[in-house]
Amino acid sequence: GLPGYFGVN
Protein backbone atom coordinates (compact mmCIF):
# COMPACT_ATOMS: atom_id res chain seq x y z
CA GLY A 1 0.00 0.00 0.00
CA LEU A 2 1.56 3.41 -1.04
CA PRO A 3 5.36 3.09 -0.44
CA GLY A 4 4.91 -0.31 1.23
CA TYR A 5 4.15 0.56 4.85
CA PHE A 6 3.82 -2.28 7.38
CA GLY A 7 5.32 -4.71 4.88
CA VAL A 8 2.14 -4.59 2.77
CA ASN A 9 2.16 -2.91 -0.68
UniProtKB/Swiss-Prot annotation:
Give the subcellular location: Cytoplasm
GO cellular component terms, A-Z: cytoplasm
| GO function terms (MF aspect) | dextransucrase activity
Keyword Glycosyltransferase among record annotations: yes
Keyword annotations for this protein, in alphabetical order, are: Cytoplasm, Glycosyltransferase, Transferase
What does the annotation record about activity and temperature?
Answer: Optimum temperature is 35 degrees Celsius.
Catalytic reactions of this protein: [(1->6)-alpha-D-glucosyl](n) + sucrose = [(1->6)-alpha-D-glucosyl](n+1) + D-fructose
DNA-binding as UniProt keyword: no
**pH dependence (UniProt free text):** Optimum pH is 5.5.
Q: Which residues form a coiled coil?
A: none
Q: Which segment of the chain is annotated as a signal peptide?
A: none
Tree of life domain = Bacteria
Q: What induces it?
A: By sucrose.
EC number(s) on file: 2.4.1.5
What's this protein's function?
Involved in the production of dextran, an extracellular glucan polymer.
- The family this protein is said to belong to: Belongs to the glycosyl hydrolase 70 family.
Q: What is this protein called?
A: Dextransucrase
Species source reads Leuconostoc mesenteroides
